[in-house]
From Swiss-Prot:
Induction: Expressed throughout cell growth. Negatively influences its own expression. This is ClpXP adapter protein SpxH. The histidine-rich N terminus is essential for interaction with Spx. SUPFAM superfamilies: Thioredoxin-like. Disruption phenotype: Strains lacking this gene show poor growth, affected sporulation, complete loss of competence development and overproduce Spx under unperturbed growth. Mutants also overproduce TrxA and show reduced sensitivity to disulfide stress. CDD domains: DsbA_FrnE_like (cd03025). GO terms for cellular component: cytoplasm. Pfam families: Thioredoxin_5 (PF13743). It comes from the Bacteria. Its main location: cytoplasm.
Length: 299
């Protein structure tokens, strides 16, 4: 499909000053619960992205994670979240790294450094960080890994290196932390919904829930139940997002995992996707030549 055809389905997801709602999503790049919300966010943006702007706020816990007595508990928690959500996150990463996942601050700072190259760039960098950690078991608190992710995200690498150690990124992260403190956010993920056309306080939703919960809140904030936008053809969806989980496809298209497997096998046979197996669930990588810098359906 051409870039124009992709935009027919995804243009409404991008930011626009006249959208009636803003959603602040507080995330920690190392948080598996945040990762587990990816299918929900994709479906919400595709169906109703014309009504809201999504703003990602870094809300990393600054508690040290490298205490040996905690590793087995963290690993167990990851395994449970993966089993429940269908979004793979391998708890073995806590035992297999030469260096511990010790600095959530560094991962959050890297996200803000990437965001200095544009919000789309930041969104795609965050997604790539999550894939690197939860699927590939890479240490995203290690600077060399972060540089590799930046390169894979097609960022200006020299600019990213400079920004990673700049006061600009630090101030941007401090700004996010201030927002989290002002909104009394203590749980990741947290979504806060604001109606930009009213002065009412926002509606804060700590934790992760099913898609239906967020859709209902969206309707409540809009005061209406609008018709959803057309869902793109599956091949278009894969081309646009490049690397997606079976769980994401299942939720967006209201399919069972068995039905997803059947449909994706057809695309794999046509050499349009490659299957990527993970510890929990399956992922699919687009093999198309379509390239649109920072495909993330953002803003």
């Amino acid at each position: 499909m051409t870039n124009y055809q992709h935009e027919l389905y995804f243009a409404h997801c991008h930011g626009h000053p006249k959208k009636p709602l803003e959603i602040y999503m507080f995330v920690d790049p190392l948080c598996p619960e945040c990762w587990s919300l990816e299918p929900v966010i994709k479906k919400l943006k595709i169906r109703y992205g014309r009504f809201f702007t999504l703003r990602i706020i870094a809300s990393a816990s600054l508690t040290a994670l490298n205490k040996k007595r905690k590793k087995h508990l963290l690993a167990e928690a990851w395994e449970k979240i993966a089993s429940r959500s269908g979004m793979s996150c391998d708890g073995n990463v806590w035992f297999e790294q030469d260096q511990p996942l010790s600095s959530p601050y560094m991962a959050a700072l890297a996200f803000k450094a990437a965001e200095l190259q544009g919000r789309k760039a930041g969104m795609q960098f965050l997604r790539n960080m999550q894939e690197s950690l939860f699927v590939s078991k890479k240490n995203i608190t290690d600077e060399n890994v972060l540089l590799e992710i930046a390169e894979n995200t097609s960022l200006d690498l020299e600019e990213f290196k400079k920004d990673l150690h700049s006061q600009s990124a630090v101030k941007a992260l401090q700004c996010d932390m201030k927002i989290a403190a002002e909104m009394d956010v203590s749980v990741n993920p947290t979504l806060t919904f604001f109606n930009t056309q009213h002065e009412d306080e926002g509606l804060k939703v700590p934790g992760s829930y099913s898609y239906d919960v967020y859709e209902e809140i969206l309707f409540e904030m809009l005061g209406d139940e609008p018709k959803p936008s057309e869902t793109p053809p599956l091949e278009c969806f894969i081309e646009y997002f490049r690397f997606v989980a079976s769980k994401e496809i299942a939720l967006v298209y209201d399919l069972s995992l068995e039905e997803v497997e059947k449909e994706m096998k057809k695309l794999a046979f046509a050499k349009k996707v490659a299957k990527v197996e993970a510890k929990h669930g399956m992922f699919w990588k687009s093999l198309s030549t379509y390239s649109d810098e920072y495909q993330s359906c953002e803003k």
